[in-house]
Curated annotation (Swiss-Prot):
Molecular function in Gene Ontology: 16S rRNA (adenine(1518)-N(6)/adenine(1519)-N(6))-dimethyltransferase activity; RNA binding
EC class of the enzyme, as a word: transferase
One term under GO cellular component: cytosol
Protein's name in the database: Ribosomal RNA small subunit methyltransferase A
Alphabetic keyword roster: Cytoplasm, Methyltransferase, RNA-binding, rRNA processing, S-adenosyl-L-methionine, Transferase
Keyword Transcription: no
PROSITE patterns: RRNA_A_DIMETH, SAM_RNA_A_N6_MT
Reported function: Specifically dimethylates two adjacent adenosines (A1518 and A1519) in the loop of a conserved hairpin near the 3'-end of 16S rRNA in the 30S particle. May play a critical role in biogenesis of 30S subunits.
Reactions the enzyme catalyzes: adenosine(1518)/adenosine(1519) in 16S rRNA + 4 S-adenosyl-L-methionine = N(6)-dimethyladenosine(1518)/N(6)-dimethyladenosine(1519) in 16S rRNA + 4 S-adenosyl-L-homocysteine + 4 H(+)
Family: Belongs to the class I-like SAM-binding methyltransferase superfamily. rRNA adenine N(6)-methyltransferase family. RsmA subfamily.
Signal peptide region: none
Residues reported in the UniProt entry to bind S-adenosyl-L-methionine: N12, L14, G38, E59, D82, N107
PANTHER family: DIMETHYLADENOSINE TRANSFERASE, DIMETHYLADENOSINE TRANSFERASE-RELATED
Amino acid sequence: MHHTTKKKYGQNFLTDVNLLNKIVTKASITDKNVLEIGPGKGALTKIIVPQAKHVLAYEIDATLKPFLNFENHNNVNIIYDDFLKRDLLKDFDHYFSPNSQLSLIGNLPYYITSPILFKIIDTPQINDATIMIQKEVGMRLLAQPNNKNYNALSVIIQFLFSIEKIQEVKRHMFFPAPKVDSIVIKLTKNNNICPTFLQQFIKFVKASFKQKRKTLLNNLSCQFLLSKETIIPFFLQHHIPLQIRAEQVTLETFQKLTVKWFIFFNIS
């Protein structure tokens, strides 16, 4: 069967069988419910299906249907649609039993990695995600303070998940070869995070990093519409240097500051 790859969907198919097997092994999906994003020609799906309890895959390119023929298996369903546009709760109600926990796996299109990550964050049924992403994005997720890659996404993802780096992947292991290298990581959700606090934390962190060249003080002043004169007493009370930038602040400090900030300024 022949298929012409489509640039608009970011199609780069992984061809290394050993790596495909390693991804599935690290995902630990035996007898679990699995979501797969972008099965493509089914190279990963063929390894997942015999091991998983049930597989629900999302493929945006319907011309790949001939490659995704799993009629001999009754534990796989493929939805030919854009994952980002789907109402996942409706899909889960239809395909899985109530209160099912899901493992996500996939080679994420580079151009929509961040929206997919935030959809994972917003979907409590997804317990963990083993994903291949652009190396540059992966290094941001793993980055620590005072590193050029450290940003709002780094802080939010590290708060929500424990992150395991599995393997860096050279571009020649794909067909067609992309212009950049990739990385495989596993995200495992940290449970028992208060939804209200999470909303506040994300709001505070995004505000802190809004403009990279600005100090934390200036960013918070602009984003929360508070004068610097109003904020300075908060900084002094909590021993925060007035010239500090967000990329110098640790995850632990962001957590503490979020709690204190919303109480201090009585912001809901």
